[in-house]
């Protein structure tokens, strides 16, 4: 069995070797670029891409198919070789054509153009009709050959469903939007009116507070003026009091030293500060009462020495 499939085994070996070469080329490139990599991750990614490109492009099946044809020819089964003699000329031409086709297939697969897209593009073409939006779909000779070979099947699972077009009731949509707009407009107006009322109330309170402050300031000014007047009147009264007492003192028959002492106490009264003036007058009165008390005690003692008695009337 191994001898009969020797060509197939050789092709599989070449494909596997190509994969290993792709992995080595990828890792070597990353090392030359100074990029750190995980070998297992690179191996997995390259294998996934390599298997996809080889399978989707048909290169693997093409190589294995030719290997099977060669093995069958070596084993005396020349049917496949005879069927391919129409396009086989010589080994170099076939090898070159296969190389170019396989290269193109792999490039298309790597670009995301899979087998289904390539087959459909090869089987059909589109012809545009000048002046019209419609077009004509043409079958290529490959499609004709596939029909003749029975390689075209009808997919009964496909159901021609009628495309439903959603009809939009624009009037209903407009009415809905208009209602939403009116509702939003009403809410905005309500909030605005509420804000206006609050602003008016704040302004009224502010004006009322300003009036109260103004009235209080006027009252304070009046009280200050009245206080100044009282202060002036008191200063005048104290000055008149001092002058009157001095005049009355001079009319008394008291000794000069007593008059001088009392005048000094009168002149020491602070006539500018009313509170200090009251304190000074209080001190003067206390001193006078104290002097009167001493004089009375002296008189009382003198009466006792003279054996006199005294009474208050």
Swiss-Prot record:
Which residues does the annotated region (Dimerization) include? 150-206
Compartment list: Host cytoplasm
List S-S links within the chain.
Answer: none
Q: Which Gene3D superfamilies match?
A: 3.30.70.1610, Nonstructural RNA-binding protein (1.20.5.970), Rotavirus non-structural protein NSP3, N-terminal domain (6.10.280.20)
| Region (Interaction with host EIF4G1) location | 208-313
Which top-level group of life is the source organism from? Viruses
Cite the residue spans of the region called Interaction with host ZC3H7B: 170-234
Molecular function per GO: RNA binding
Q: InterPro entries, alphabetically?
A: NSP3_N_rotavirus, NSP3_sf, Rotavirus_NSP3
Which segments cross the bilayer? none
Q: Which UniProt keywords apply?
A: Coiled coil, Host cytoplasm, Host-virus interaction, RNA-binding, Translation regulation
Has the keyword Coiled coil been applied to this entry? yes
Coiled-coil intervals in this record? 166-237
Q: Name its GO BP terms in alphabetical order.
A: regulation of translation
This entry carries the following GO cellular component terms, namely: host cell cytoplasm
Main subcellular location = host cell
Query: Where in this protein does the record put region RNA-binding?
Result: 1-149
Physiological role: Plays an important role in stimulating the translation of viral mRNAs. These mRNAs are capped but not polyadenylated, instead terminating in a conserved sequence 'GACC' at the 3' that is recognized by NSP3, which competes with host PABPC1 for EIF4G1 binding. The interaction between NSP3 and host EIF4G1 stabilizes the EIF4E-EIF4G1 interaction, thereby facilitating the initiation of capped mRNA translation.
HAMAP family cross-referenced by the UniProt entry: ROTA_A_NSP3, ROTA_NSP3
Assembly with partners or alone: Homodimer. Interacts (via the coiled-coil region) with host ZC3H7B (via LD motif). Interacts with host EIF4G1.
Q: Report the family membership.
A: Belongs to the rotavirus NSP3 family.
Which protein, by its recorded name, is this? Non-structural protein 3
Protein source organism: Rotavirus A (isolate RVA/Human/United States/WI61/1983/G9P1A[8])
